[in-house]
Amino acid sequence: MKHLLLIALFAACGHQPQAVEPHPELTTRRAQMLGYLAEYTERGVFPTDERGLPLSVFEDAHGVRCPMAELIYRSGHPELVAAIVAEDNHARLGDIHDGPVHDWMVGSGLTHDEIVMIQGIADINYGPLFKIEQPANVITAQRERVRGRLETAQAALRKDQRDSLTAATLVLPQHRVPVVKVTRPAIAKH
């Protein structure tokens, strides 16, 4: 009996989990997302409130999209962005775990944590002092703060891409990239 236990123990220790290769479609989509994000950052036009300060919404009153809305839009899903804006313009993608928005996220080539990081870039706590009119230099400084956060996020996204792609591949349902079909509600939260 002792020998059987030792044999089972050695067999279990010798078992190597099979390495997961990143899904090729996710690799392509991730490269597209990083390209779109670089163009968005270079353009330097971010959602703002009525005073011109950066605002964390999917789309502002002038139709300017947040970084994640831009990625969804540029990837061929403007109807998904419109649905999110209509349902909850302040939606946090990290809270969405089902439905067409979730399907898009799973198939984007980005991990859940990366999506949360990108969307959180414009989350700036201005505090009570920012309830009054702000001079142009303060507005410019806050916009540059958003640009700096975007540049930092891009550097993080380029680092360890293989690990990120492997993580994104592991959450694919049945190793298949979901097809995004916009239904209502587009945002399904648990």
Predicted regions and their residues:
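Second-shell loop/turn segments in exported
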Residues: V20-L26, L53-A61, M68, N89-R92, ...
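Glycine-rich short-loop/terminal segments
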Residues: Q18-G44
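Stable alpha-helical elements in mature extracytoplasmic
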Residues: R29, M33, V64-P67, H97, ...
